[in-house]
């Protein structure tokens, strides 16, 4: 993670360009921890989003949404996340209308996900769950006995796409409170 002032400077440039073109911007401060794109970052108490840093970052950058660290890690699917709801409430109170984003949502239970939404989270990323399921289905499909060099890719990738669709519909239903 970049030092906060360097992050602010870079984000200000992105926001100026994006907003001039009608595009919203999601920012992130600190480090979520976990593994993403092959990079592993250890999670510790220092990685939780500090409300005063979040407020400073939002006030300086004017991002539309902010990814906050409240107890999840990127790439988490073997263990259950321990969400710090007091921190979530404090961040929501300080940041007001800025959309809060939860990275590392794959390790979050449905009940915790619903509570995060009730308490102000506007977006929850579940990329690891989608990747894991897609790879599992594709692996089975590509190694089936009836696959030949002439098999259509639509037939090979279709089942994985359907599985992703099912997961997305299921996760989206958690946002309907």
Which ranges hold each PLM region?
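Alpha/beta enzyme core
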Residues: 1-98, 110, 114-119, 139-140, ...
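Generic hydrophobic/packing signal
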Residues: 63, 103, 156-157
